[in-house]
Design a protein with these regions (language model features):
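Short, small-residue-biased leader/transition segments that mark boundaries at the very start
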Residues: 1-2
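Short glycine/proline-enriched loop/turn "hinge" motifs that connect secondary-structure elements
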Residues: 9, 18-25, 107-110, 198-200
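N-terminal short beta-loop-beta anion/metal-coordinating cradle
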Residues: 12
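Non-catalytic N-terminal regions of enzymes
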Residues: 15, 27, 37-39
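Short hydrophobic beta-strand that contains or immediately precedes a catalytic carboxylate
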Residues: 31-32
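Conserved His + Asp/Glu catalytic blocks
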Residues: 35-45, 51-60, 65-71, 80-245
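Conserved, mostly hydrophobic/aromatic
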Residues: 76
Length: 245
């Protein structure tokens, strides 16, 4: 049901890795859970890191069921080749540390295009614990339902060790916090209509255009408006950071 009959796949753990039938990246994969289970990141972030480690030429992507997931009722990830340079789409600098431990840190981005939280750690267990801690706090914003989030995770992009200057391997993750599924322009008719339903690609700066008539409507101002409309407000982000400080 969730994989085309003619699609071939490779097994990786309890997932099937397939070519995405509607690619928007040069190397674009869909990673499908073998069993029919709902789309949720809860208790799945460790799987995301497993995929990132075993597919280390790729960035692993997650869309929440109300944040652009192509099959919102069946668990899946996507992957894009690291050549896409979408791991830090806007040159974001996460400089405001929210919480740190011995081997991991997460920080939030203020006044950016999106409302985002970054996590990094050289330690796999450290980033898992940090994500799970954050997830529990984020859920409260969405009244205990599946949070409106998009997530990108990767392993193996080299970073500079602040203390020794050596290049190290590091786990990284960016969580995009959302306020809604789609902007108003998605539902609008006529000239105001713009068929954009942001998922992880759009949150990372890639906007596939479905309709030719929408090409002339895409401007930097419009994209900025869409980001602001579908992203969690700075006030809500502050409430979250206050909880985790």
């Amino acid at each position: 049901v969730y994989k085309r009959q003619e699609q071939t796949s490779l097994s990786l753990g309890h997932y099937e890795v397939c070519l995405n039938p509607y690619p928007i990246f040069r190397r674009h994969l869909t990673i499908i859970e073998e069993e029919h289970t709902p789309q949720t990141i809860k208790n799945r972030f460790e799987d995301m890191l497993f995929l990132a480690e075993n597919m280390n030429e790729f960035l692993i992507l997650y869309n929440g069921p109300e944040c652009g997931a192509s099959a919102p009722d069946h668990m899946h990830f996507q992957a894009a080749g690291k050549e896409e340079k979408i791991a830090n789409p806007f040159g974001m600098t996460f400089i405001s540390d929210m919480l740190s431990s011995e081997d991991s840190v997460h920080s939030h981005l203020e006044n950016g295009f999106t409302t985002s939280i970054g996590i990094s750690s050289p330690n796999r267990r450290g980033i898992i614990e940090m994500f799970e801690y954050l997830y529990d706090k984020i859920v409260s914003i969405y009244h205990d339902k599946e949070p409106l989030i998009n997530v990108i995770a990767w392993y193996g992009l080299e970073t500079v060790n602040r203390t020794g200057g050596d290049e190290i391997k590091q786990w990284n993750c960016i969580i995009f916090l959302r306020s809604k599924h789609r902007p108003e322009c998605y539902y609008a008719q006529g000239k105001k209509g713009l068929l954009i339903s942001p998922a992880i690609a759009e949150m990372c700066g890639v906007f596939p255009i479905v309709r030719e008539e929408d090409l002339d409507k895409i401007t930097a101002k419009k994209i900025t408006q869409i980001y602001k409309e579908v992203s969690l407000s700075q006030e809500q982000l502050k409430a979250l950071t206050d909880q985790t400080s």
